[in-house]
Every structure is written in C-alpha cells, then in structure tokens.
Amino acid sequence: MNTLNRRDFPGALYPERIIQFGEGNFLRAFIDWQIDLLNEHTDLNSGVVIVRPIKSDFPPSLSVQDGLYTTIIRGLNEQGEAVSDARLIRSVNREISVYSQYDEFLKLAHNPDMRFVFSNTTEAGISYHAEDKFDDAPAVSYPAKLTRLLFERFSHFNGAADKGWVIIPCELIDYNGDALRELVLRYAQEWALPAEFTQWLNDANAFCSTLVDRIVTGYPRDEVTALETELGYHDGFLDTAEHFYLFVIQGPKSLASELRLDKLSLNVLIVDDIKPYKERKVAILNGAHTALVPVAFQAGLDTVGEAMNDAEVCAFVEKAIYQEIIPVLDLPKDELESFASAVTGRFRNPYIKHQLLSIALNGMTKYRTRILPQLLAGQKATGKLPARLTFALAALIAFYRGERNGESYPVQDDQHWLDRYQQLWAQHHDKQISTSELVKAVLSVSEHWEQDLTNVSGLVEQVTLDLDAILLQGMRAAVKQLC
C-alpha cells in the first residue's frame, strides 16, 4: 500500500500565500480543510506553509507526505443522518521547523504573495516571554517569532503599505487578535525597532479576533487499518473531526471577498464583534454540557450520546436550552435556535464517545462561567428562578459526593473544593449539618461565585428542595418533573 505523496497522487499545487503557525490536528481539520474547499470551488488559489513553532520531532513533519493528508469528517448532518466524508487535503504545500530551518522561516517574509497568517499555538501560546530577543534564532514565544517575521517583511519590502498581512489567530483565548497585536507591539517597543515599523504594523496589517468551534478527534488509532483499506493508501496523518464547524472572524468586511467567502457558502461569519457569538457558544454549547453532566451521570449514564438518547435526560437538556438559556441571550432568536439545534445534533454524534466524567472536570468553575449568568438573568427578567438551571446546581452539589450506586468515581476540581465537599458531605452523612446548611456553605463562597449566592432570593431554598429530592428519591425520580 502506497504512502501518500504528490508523485503517486498527483493533483493541484497552489502558490504559497498562507503561513500557519501550528501543525496540530485542529488546524488541519479546520483551517486547512476550509482552505482546501475554497481552493477547489473558488479562485482563492492559496497554498499553506506550516511552521512548526515548537522544538519537537514528534509527530514527524507533514513534508514526508508532501503536505498531503486525509480528513474524515463524520457526524450527523443537518437532516440528522449519520455521514462520513473522506477528503484528500491538497492545500498544504510543506512544513518547516522554525528551530532547524530558521533561514527558511525568515524567507517566508520575502514572498510578495504571502497574505494570511493563521495560528493555533495552544491557549498558552499567545503569551509574553521576557527573555525573547530580536537576534534569537528563534525566540521562544509565538508573538516574538511573529514580530521578527513581520519585521523581516517590513524591511524586505521597505515598509510597503500593500505588503501587510491579515493575521487570524485561532487560540482559545478571549479577543485573541487583540492580545496577539498587543504583544507584537510590545516586542517592537522593547526591541527598539523603528517607529516606522510600529506605524506599518498598525496601518498595513489586520489582527483579527476569532471564535473557532469544531470537535477534532484527530488520528483514529483504533480504526486506522479499516480506514486505510477503504482509502487504498497509507496516511500517517489521518485526521478525524465532527461534521459541525463554525468560524467567526472579527475583521474588515473586505475579508469575505479576499478569502472568497462570497463565492462559497461556508459556515464562516465576518462580524464587527465576536462577543455575542462567544456568549452564545458558552451559554448554549458549554452551558448545556455543564447542566447535562451531573444529571445524566447520576441517572446512570456514561456518555453524552447515551444521555441524548435517553428521552427524559434529553428533554431536560433541551428545555433548559430553549426555555431558560435562549430567552436571556442577546442575539436574534432564530439564530440562537438554529445554533441550539446544531448543538443537540452534535451531542448525538454516534462517532464521538464523549465521557461525562471527562467533561465534569472543574465543574464548579464551569457552572459559574457557563450557567450562573443565565440563571441570574432569568430570575431578573421573570422574577422566578429558572427551574432546570437551578436543579443543575443541586445535581452538581450531589455529584461531588463522588459515589454512584455504592461505587466511587473520581471527581476532578480545585483541591479546595474537593476538601470542602469531602468535609460537608461527611458532616451531612453524620447528621451534623442539614441539607440546607450544606447548600448555604457552598453558595456562600463569595471568592468563587464573585458574590454571596445565599443573597439570591429563593436560591438556597430551591436548591435545598432539589438536593433533598435527589438524595431521597434518586436522580431519575427527582428530575422527572422537569423533563
């Protein structure tokens, strides 16, 4: 069986116009996959050079396959049908290492056709490293590497206004474009680079903030033999992902035509502010996950898929989304409902086994950031506590007992919460404190909740009622009235 390469698998080769910092699975099944579609269906005509930003030989360089690899996109489509689509990606030309090919890295800036820079260097990637110097070959941090590359371009083209770049980071931090721009400007200042360079950075370059959304499951280790037999070739860089994807870019409207998004309907939005889209994702996708986990797990289920195939648990989650979360969000209702419908479809994806316990990690912080804002907004708007979001808090407190049907399970959170819950549940078990006192002890931790939740009208009472119902009747019976 042949390994993928351009000699044995000839096809389109595109001129290099895109630099991509990051060789990982996510960008390959998200950015490079979209570029490949645009190359095929429009005149975008843009090849990608991947820059490996870290000092590592693993995984091997994509150049061993001449940049070729296969994506397998699978999940439920818009009609709710299970689909699996294999695509040979030709958008990547080569991969270089910034550590072993530094001159080659700088040379990328000399190409007059280079226009876009994408990146995913992990959440920690857009950060400041005080020791980074201009002459380092290379600097440690991604922003410092980018500053050096931008200065190379500025110098090579004598500050030409039409040689700036559109920089589109995909790291999972708020306003990632603004954060990256600030660090590039900081390095320019600390390295005492000319004022003209700073002017050119500001005037000729666009730093766009983004929201990215797709579950990328990566190399399908357990299925690789069957998949390669089906494909008819060996591919050491197979990359699997869910059917759903969303790319929101906060940038100039002209970006739509420059990326040829006006010629192919992709799920990419060019917007003035990503904030409402971020809030939508956190509230609906992440919020539904966080409400679902303690309820479904204590109802005897182990994966998100099992939970969505359980009529009662599914009804609980869908009612939480449509009746309690969507009404308090600030985007058009039809947009929110369409997104919510996609979310529940993603939860049902038969190709992804999403363990509830793995999503349960740091549940206390997740509840505060993902659900509490909607609970408080709902109470403010209607004068009543949203029943399911409140019940989810009681279920979360019950989850921290760490025991289901007499068997213990691992609970992962900050140590102070683990210690606090261990003590509270032991005291409750020994009848030293009542359920109401336990609830008050959790809701009054202002340094966590950023307020004293015992002051929220009716919250202690309702969480206590819900928690007592869970403890006395079991999760199935307790949640039934809300399904």
From Swiss-Prot:
Top EC category: oxidoreductase
Cross-referenced Gene3D superfamilies: N-(1-d-carboxylethyl)-l-norvaline Dehydrogenase, domain 2, NAD(P)-binding Rossmann-like Domain
Record's GO cellular component terms: cytosol
Reaction catalysis annotation: D-altronate + NAD(+) = keto-D-tagaturonate + NADH + H(+)
EC number(s) per entry: 1.1.1.58
GO terms for MF: mannitol-1-phosphate 5-dehydrogenase activity; tagaturonate reductase activity
Name by which UniProt lists this protein: Altronate oxidoreductase
